[in-house]
């Protein structure tokens, strides 16, 4: 329906004569409210909802009217004062202050008790004390001269044989650890400290003497060397066979005058 047409809708019939005296105050109130809200949003001031209430709503309406009239943007409510310290927290602080010297006295008593226990332990016999430096000197000599002569290597080999029983115990403990291990990697397993000292590795270094290498590692080393030699021999044989085959093919092709290039390249008789 165009405005020029004679037909009027219900809206046009109802509001054809707007009465400004009735709707003017409502329009001004809504206009001032929108202006105040726009100024408040554009000011980027933090809004504190603690003072929200009937009194706050009346103040908000008053501030919106003043801002709509051209006043400055409404200020945010003042921050609330800090809450008073409760007496319970004061009592806890006093207890902690009192408990600090008592804990120090208890720690001193524990240290004295540990010293008394250490003094009460029986002293080691003289023989054990004398044997330890001898073992240390032996280990130092073996470490200093890894590439020594054969007669010097024999006592170190005997010493290693005598300590085989001592080597077996960490292997048993490692087997127990493997038995107790979970079949799947659990979450957070990397944070746990694992005992890697009892797990013996048999990596063979090129500079390591024979008497210091584990027997299984020596067997593996020899087996790998034998396999390498076999592979080298097989490659040499294959290369020699290929060379002989090519030489025979060239000789036969040159000797036969009826062999064409196609027959030489693509025939099965070649």
Curated annotation (Swiss-Prot):
It is found in: Cytoplasm, Cytoskeleton, Microtubule organizing center, Centrosome, Centriole; Cytoplasm, Cytoskeleton, Spindle; Cytoplasm, Cytoskeleton; Cytoplasm, Cytoskeleton, Cilium basal body. A motif (ST]-E-Y-X(3)-Y motif 1) lies at residues 9-15. The keyword Phosphoprotein does not apply. GO terms for molecular function: microtubule binding. Keywords: Acetylation, Cell cycle, Cell division, Cell projection, Cilium, Cytoplasm, Cytoskeleton, Developmental protein, Microtubule, Mitosis. Residues 92-101, 127-144 have a biased composition (Basic and acidic residues). Transmembrane segments: none annotated. Residues 50-201, 231-255 are annotated as: Disordered. One of its GO terms (cellular component) is ciliary basal body. The modification N-acetylmethionine is found at residue 1. Pfam families: CCSAP. InterPro entries: CSAP. Residues 102-118 have a biased composition (Acidic residues). Residues 75-86 have a biased composition (Pro residues). Residues 53-67 have a biased composition (Low complexity). A motif (ST]-E-Y-X(3)-Y motif 2) lies at residues 260-266. Associates with microtubules; the association occurs on polyglutamylated tubulin. Belongs to the CCSAP family. This is Centriole, cilia and spindle-associated protein. It comes from Homo sapiens. The lineage of its organism: Eukaryota, Metazoa, Chordata, Craniata, Vertebrata. The gene is CCSAP.
